[in-house]
């Protein structure tokens, strides 16, 4: 199994499973063909693969479910929040292009919104990076119980995928399952196969 397959399975499975709006994964330079292949395969299922940043050695790839991201970005509170950072957009694609431009400078902490993090927690981090109540997939400042349950779902999904890959399986098996069962308008978590849930 290639390092790219493992990284995608480990870091992005929760997004393909519908548990998360989007994920980031760092890949070695030279894996552009893999990204393009997956992007074509999943475009009809509502997923987008976007190269946010690259340097001499690494690629930072953003993978999202377009419909879910669009719904979140166009919620009034999120749109007003992003406007504070200069975002003006008529589509999720336009917002992502602006994020990509901002990635050329200091790391933009509003990226949490693009990953589907609760707005209250994104704002909390900007106010007080060290004042979180709980730390998991993101730093939590409110609704701790709900966040803890979400983190546990993420953990179970990722752990099962990684266990399968560590035993010699291929992440492609899960990608093929996600591809088959995803739909462009999927707005809720998918029912994963037994091997993804029997932990």
Tell where the protein language model's regions lie, with residue ranges.
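A structured, charge-rich N-terminal accessory region that forms the first stable segment of a protein
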Residues: 1-55
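Short, surface-exposed beta-edge/turn micro-motifs
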Residues: 20-22, 57-59, 108-110
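A glycine-rich, hydrophobic loop/mini-helix early in the fold
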Residues: 35-91
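Short acidic alpha-helix initiation/capping motifs at coil-to-helix transition points
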Residues: 73-74, 99-106, 129-132
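Internal catalytic-core helix/loop-beta-alpha segment
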Residues: 84-109
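Hydrophobic/aromatic-rich, well-ordered segments within soluble, folded domains that form packed cores
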Residues: 108-134
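Long, compositionally biased
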Residues: 137-187, 193
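Gram-positive cell-envelope targeting signals
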Residues: 192-199
